[in-house]
Amino acid sequence: VTPADPRSEDGPRARFERSIGFTLDPFQHRAMDAIDRGESVLVSAPTGSGKTLVADYAVARALDAGGKAFYTTPIKALSNQKFAELGARYGAHRVGLLTGDISHQPGAPIVVMTTEVLRNMLFARSTLLDDLQVVILDEVHYLQDPYRGSVWEEVLVLSPPGVVFVSLSATVNNAKDFGRWLTSVRGTTRVVVETHRPVTLHHHYAVAERGRDGVAVLPLLRNGAPNPDGLKLDERRKRSVHQRFRAPRRSEVVEYLHAAGMLPAITFIFSRAACDDATRQVVDDGLRLTTDAERARIRSLVESSVERLSDDDLRTLGYGPWSAALEAGVAPHHAGLVPAFRQAVERCFSEGLLK
């Protein structure tokens, strides 16, 4: 992936920069310089800062050199999203997808897959590895996961020597140490760290008062220190036998966000069943967050996603309540959903139809 003069007017770097239509940040330039030198690179940057643009450039370089690029992600939802993005950029015929559920165009020059799929290909010495030039490891900090981290390590150790790795991570404290380890395993690996967060994070408490409807929202921090109003609430809760305040219902939080113009929102719940229960609670409490036009579009996307499932299958899977929730603008998303349902949720979310 090191053709001559990548920065020349007709070179891959110049063509790529023209195609994106905006000026790159310095950290993106540094990472792309490393790729132009044929080096692997570790990019550590906050969410929303544009680190995936570095991966997109590495993919473009591999294609320009007549090779293949594999884009790995830790979860199927990210694979599906990246598959759609790369297909829109390079053409659907040039992008494949390999997950536990789907095998679509595995011989394409760009293949998006979960990291476990690549590990299994390496174990099997698959011919799909022929001409592989670039591997993107998205969310590479999963390497530190006690349960799945060995998968990322095996991919790094077992991949052919000439493959360039572009490893993407959220901000980590030990990026330089991580980079030194990558260099020991893969050869020269440039570490590029960006600390500026372009999308500011704001943290809040949400509380409700017993016997009353509605939600009060308090900033978690004030002038960089814990909000004293929040600390007072906490102290009252500890002292009081009959607590005045309670955790708000999910529907109350959604109503607050809706009134404040803060939708769409994602609620993270660490249980599949609890995700489904939360969806039912919001819908059963009467929230309808979509317009007539949005509901019609949701219905169309849902019907196209489930068209291969029989009526009996749909009844067994609880299609009626699930699709009604989607039309209301609310949906669960987790690995327990059948692929057709999960695809419908992702398509609706990507179009801004889910709230």
How would you describe each model-predicted region?
Residues 1-41, 67, 292-327:
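Helicase-associated low-complexity/disordered flanking segments
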Residues 67-123, 180, 190:
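Conserved nucleic-acid-binding Ia/Ib motif block in the N-terminal RecA-like helicase ATPase lobe
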Residues 111, 115-117, 123-167:
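SF2 helicase catalytic motif II
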Residues 37-43, 67-68, 108-109, 163-164, ...:
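Pre-Walker A (Motif I) flank of P-loop NTPase domains
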Residues 44-47, 54-81, 160-162:
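Conserved SF1/SF2 helicase motif Ia
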Residues 157, 164-166, 171-281, 331, ...:
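Conserved interdomain linker/interface between the two RecA-like ATPase lobes of SF2 helicase motors
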